[in-house]
From Swiss-Prot:
Keywords: Chloroplast, Electron transport, Membrane, Photosynthesis, Plastid, Thylakoid, Transmembrane, Transmembrane helix, Transport
Domain of life: Eukaryota
Annotated protein name in UniProt: Cytochrome b6-f complex subunit 6
Subunit details: The 4 large subunits of the cytochrome b6-f complex are cytochrome b6, subunit IV (17 kDa polypeptide, PetD), cytochrome f and the Rieske protein, while the 4 small subunits are PetG, PetL, PetM and PetN. The complex functions as a dimer.
Chloroplast recorded as keyword: yes
A matching Pfam family: PetL
Stored InterPro entries: Cyt_b6/f_cplx_su6
Family indicated by similarity: Belongs to the PetL family.
Known role: Component of the cytochrome b6-f complex, which mediates electron transfer between photosystem II (PSII) and photosystem I (PSI), cyclic electron flow around PSI, and state transitions. PetL is important for photoautotrophic growth as well as for electron transfer efficiency and stability of the cytochrome b6-f complex.
Location of this chain's protein in the cell: Plastid, Chloroplast thylakoid membrane
PANTHER family with a match to the protein in the record: CYTOCHROME B6-F COMPLEX SUBUNIT 6
GO MF term set: electron transporter, transferring electrons within cytochrome b6/f complex of photosystem II activity
Species name: Hordeum vulgare (Barley)
Amino acid sequence: MLTLTSYFGFLLAALTITPALFIGLNKIRLI
């Protein structure tokens, strides 16, 4: 149960951080 929760938490964090980094890189390239 704990491993499943941590796995979903990690997946959610990855889905949240990855687009943020992608947008950040795009903004840096635009500037």
